[in-house]
From Swiss-Prot:
UniProt keyword list: Activator, DNA-binding, Ethylene signaling pathway, Nucleus, Transcription, Transcription regulation
A GO BP annotation: positive regulation of DNA-templated transcription
SMART domains: AP2
Molecular function in Gene Ontology: DNA binding; DNA-binding transcription factor activity
SUPFAM superfamilies attached to this UniProt entry: DNA-binding domain (SSF54171)
InterPro entries named among the record's database cross-references: AP2/ERF_dom (IPR001471), AP2/ERF_dom_sf (IPR036955), DNA-bd_dom_sf (IPR016177)
Gene3D superfamilies documented for this protein: AP2/ERF domain (3.30.730.10)
UniProt main location, coarse: nucleus
Organism: Arabidopsis thaliana
Gene: RAP2-1
The protein, known as: Ethylene-responsive transcription factor RAP2-1
Family as reported in the entry's similarity comment: Belongs to the AP2/ERF transcription factor family. ERF subfamily.
Composition skew (Basic and acidic residues), residue ranges: 1-10
Length: 153
């Protein structure tokens, strides 16, 4: 029995040490109020105050767009004291967002405004990213059914 334990500890000692990554680092979400689906889309949702229900804010291609949609919704639900992902960006849009109207705004209108901002950010990010179709030159394939001319050989 002791010999088995010694062999087990010897095997453990022979293995090279592995770097340990804390669980909270590996599973940390990039932004508040969003999550990633298995197929890669990012979704945003928020809990309504004093309710168990969640307010669906939409599905987006980028995490930034989902986070911006969340920021708009949380601002409308909780006011200027809300914890935001991008507080500087919301301050730039302050003329569009009025904290005075947040208290009685219906959930459908909050969802609509958040989805509008998220879609706008998604579109901006998609247009800013260079498209693979535009950056690669077209490939000209030769017709293999024709006999090559002497200059082509």
């Amino acid at each position: 029995m002791e010999r088995e334990q010694e062999e087990s500890t010897m095997r453990k000692r022979r293995q090279p040490p592995q770097e340990e990554v804390p669980n909270h680092v590996a599973t940390r979400k990039p932004y508040r109020g969003i999550r990633r689906r298995k197929w890669g889309k990012w979704v945003a949702e928020i809990r309504e105050p004093n309710k168990r229900s969640r307010l669906w804010l939409g599905s987006y291609t980028t995490d930034i767009a989902a986070a911006r949609a969340y920021d708009v919704a949380v601002f409308y639900l909780r006011g200027p004291s809300a914890r935001l992902n991008f507080p500087d960006l919301l301050l730039q849009e302050e003329d569009h967002l009025s904290a005075a109207t947040t208290a009685d705004m219906p959930a459908a209108l909050i969802r609509e405004k958040a989805a509008e901002v998220g879609a706008r950010v998604d579109a901006l990010l998609a247009s800013a990213a260079p498209s693979m179709a535009h950056s690669t030159p077209p490939v000209i394939k030769p017709d293999l059914n024709q006999i090559p001319e002497s200059g082509d050989i």
